[in-house]
Amino acid sequence: MLRAASNGLRNTVAARSVSLSAANHSDAKRSDIAQYKVVDHAYDAVVVGAGGAGLRAAMGLAEGGLKTAVITKLFPTRSHTVAAQGGINAALGNMNPDNWRWHFYDTVKGSDWLGDQDAIHYMTREAERAVIELENYGMPFSRTTDGKIYQRAFGGQSNDFGRGGQAHRTCCVADRTGHSLLHTLYGASLQYNCNYFVEYFALDLIMENGVCVGVIAMDLEDGTIHRFRSKNTVLATGGYGRAFFSCTSAHTCTGDGTALTARAGINNSDMEFVQFHPTGIYGAGCLITEGSRGEGGYLVNSAGERFMERYAPNAKDLASRDVVSRSMTVEIMEGRGVGPDKDHIYLQLHHLPAEQLQQRLPGISETAMIFAGVDVTKEPIPVIPTVHYNMGGVPTNYKGQVLNYTPKKGDEVVPGLYAAGECGAHSVHGANRLGANSLLDLVIFGRACAIDILKNTSAGVGVPELPKNAGEASVANIDKLRHNKGDISTAELRLTMQKSMQNHAAVFRRGDILKEGVKVLSKLYKDQAHLNVADKGLVWNSDLIETLELQNLLINATQTIVAAENREESRGAHARDDFPDRLDELDYSKPLEGQTKKELKDHWRKHSIIRSNIETGEVSLDYRPVIDTTLDKSETDWVPPKVRSY
C-alpha cells in the first residue's frame, strides 16, 4: 500500500535529466550524468525519518490537513526507536505521588545545568498529555493490579526536588517500550494521508537565500533522484552512534540529519556530549535496559561488591548514566573488573524472582541468552559502558524551529526547517540525558513541530519553487563516488574512524589524546578522496549508500572530537582527566556571596556552536549562553546550578 501511494504520486510529477558543468564533479564523463533521472514533487511539509519523532510529526501535519511526505531510508517499523527498551517518563503518580515540576528539576539536574530550561519546562509539563495520547492511540502499557499504567524506577529521578527518595516515573511496555511505541504510531499514522517514500535516502537540503525549500533524495530501488519542494521540512533522522566502534545503535544511525545541516551551512550544537550507557553487553554492544536496575538489579565488581554504593550513596545503581558509566570505568581501571582480562562488570539479576524477570524484563532475558549465553535467572550479565545517545545535534527552540547562531545576531530561526528527536538539540538533555526522556523527546517535539507548522501554513499555499539547478551538487557527489578510482574501501575507512573515535573520545578524555584524535580524524576526512565504490550501478547499490553514510559519519565525528578537545572542563557525559571540574559562571561549591560572575568567555556553562567546512573538514566553534528562564515563572521557576551529586 505504501509503495503504491508513492508510485501513484510519481505519475503526476515531472521527470527530467540533470545537466552539470564539468567543474561540479570529478573526472566523471559528461555522458554519465544523463543516467540520473530526476523526479519533482511538491508538498506542504516533508518529514525526513520515520522513527518516533518523524511519525509523530507526520501524523500531526496530515491530521491538520497538510499534504505531507515522509522520506525514510528504511521501513518505518525498522527505525531505531524500535530498540528503546526501558520506558517513557511522565509524572502520572501511579506508583507514588509525583509532580511534573519534580521531573523538571531532575531533568535540569541530569543535564548538569547545560539544558535550556524553557524547553525542559515544555517537555516535562506536556509529558502526561503525551503518554495519555499514546494510550489513546492503543499503546499497550504494562499495568498495575488495579489497571493503571505501571511505572518503574529509573536513574536520576527523585520525588520532591531530590528530597523525597527514588521516583517511579517511567511508563513502560515490559522492556520493549520503543517497539510498542513505534508500531503504535505507525499504525495510527495510516489513518491519515501521509505519503511514504520508503527506502529513499536524503542527500541534501535545498536552500535558497537562507530558507529551506525542500530536500533532495535518492530512491534506493532504481537510483532516481527526487526533489521534494516544500514550505516546511522536519529532520527526524536519529543519532550518529555508528561513529564509534562499540555502540548500541543500529547500523543505520549515521547522523544523516546533522550532516544535512552541516552541508547546508547551518550550525550544530553540543556534539561533544556523547552518552555511554552503563550496560551494553560485553563484546556485543547490545543494550541491557536501565529498567533492569529499576526492577532491582545491581552492578558488582570482581569482589562481588555493589560498588555504586561508594560512588552514589543515595541513588546507588540508579544514579544518572554518566555517573554510573564513569564509576564502572574507574572500577575496571583500578583492577576490579571481572572476566579473564578484568575488563568488564557484572549486572546481577538472578536474585530477582523468575516470574518478575519474565513479566517485566522478557526482552533482555532473551537478549542476554543470545548474545552473552547467560541465563539471567542463574548468572550475571557481563556488561560495559557503550555509546548509546547523542545529546548534541541540530539546535532548535522548544517549538522545534532550527536555530542558526552568530555572536553578533544571536539565535536566528532558519525559515522552513525543523528538527525533532535525537538529531535535534532542543536542548532538554544538555550534557547528559536521563533514561526514558528520549522517547518523551520524540513525541513531545515531533508534535511541537507539527503544531508550529500548522499555525503558519495553509494547505497548498506558498509551496516554494525550486532554485535553478537544485540538486546539482548532490548528483555530482554521487557521480564522483561511483567513478572514483581510489584504493580505500568504505568498510576499511569506516572501521578506522570508529576505532579512532573509541580510542580518542571515550568515557574519560584527556587533552593530548583528544588532540591526537583530531589529527587522525582530519586525515581520515581527507582520505575520503581515495574511496573506491566497487558497485558502479544505481539499482540497490548498498555500497554507494554506505559510502554516503560514511560521509555523514565523518562530518559528525570531526565535529564531536574537535568540540570535545576544545571544552576544557568536565560536565555531564564529557569527562576530562586533565580538567576534572565543572567550570560555571560562579563556584557553586562555595557561598555565592562576594563572588563575581564570570563572563561567557571565561566559563563553560554554555552551548558549543559547531560549523564544518565540508570541502576541507575543518571545524570552527562559537558558544552561546544556556537559557535559564522558564516559559512561565508562575508555573515553575528556574533551577539554579549547584554541585551535582546522587
Swiss-Prot record:
Gene that encodes the chain: sdha-1
Family: Belongs to the FAD-dependent oxidoreductase 2 family. FRD/SDH subfamily.
Molecular-function GO term, any one: electron transfer activity
Names of the cofactor(s): FAD
Catalytic reaction annotation: a quinone + succinate = fumarate + a quinol
Locations listed in the record: Mitochondrion inner membrane
InterPro entries the record matches: FAD-dep_OxRdtase_2_FAD-bd (IPR003953), FAD/NAD-bd_sf (IPR036188), FRD_SDH_FAD_BS (IPR003952), Fum_R/Succ_DH_flav-like_C_sf (IPR037099), Fum_Rdtase/Succ_DH_flav-like_C (IPR015939), SdhA/FrdA/AprA (IPR030664), Succ_DH/fumarate_Rdtase_cat_sf (IPR027477), Succ_DH_flav_su_fwd (IPR011281)
Active-site residue list: 321
Transit peptide, start-end: 1-31
Binding annotation for substrate: 277, 289, 388, 433
Subunit structure: Component of complex II composed of four subunits: a flavoprotein (FP), an iron-sulfur protein (IP), and a cytochrome b composed of a large and a small subunit.
EC number, as in UniProt: 1.3.5.1
Chain sites annotated for binding FAD: 49-54, 72-87, 256, 422, 438-439
Keyword rRNA-binding among UniProt keywords: no
Pathway: Carbohydrate metabolism; tricarboxylic acid cycle; fumarate from succinate (eukaryal route): step 1/1
A Pfam short name: FAD_binding_2
Gene Ontology terms: cellular component: mitochondrial inner membrane; mitochondrion; respiratory chain complex II (succinate dehydrogenase)
Keywords: Electron transport, FAD, Flavoprotein, Membrane, Mitochondrion, Mitochondrion inner membrane, Oxidoreductase, Transit peptide, Transport, Tricarboxylic acid cycle
Species this protein is from: Caenorhabditis elegans
Stated name of the protein: Succinate dehydrogenase [ubiquinone] flavoprotein subunit, mitochondrial
Membrane topology: Peripheral membrane protein
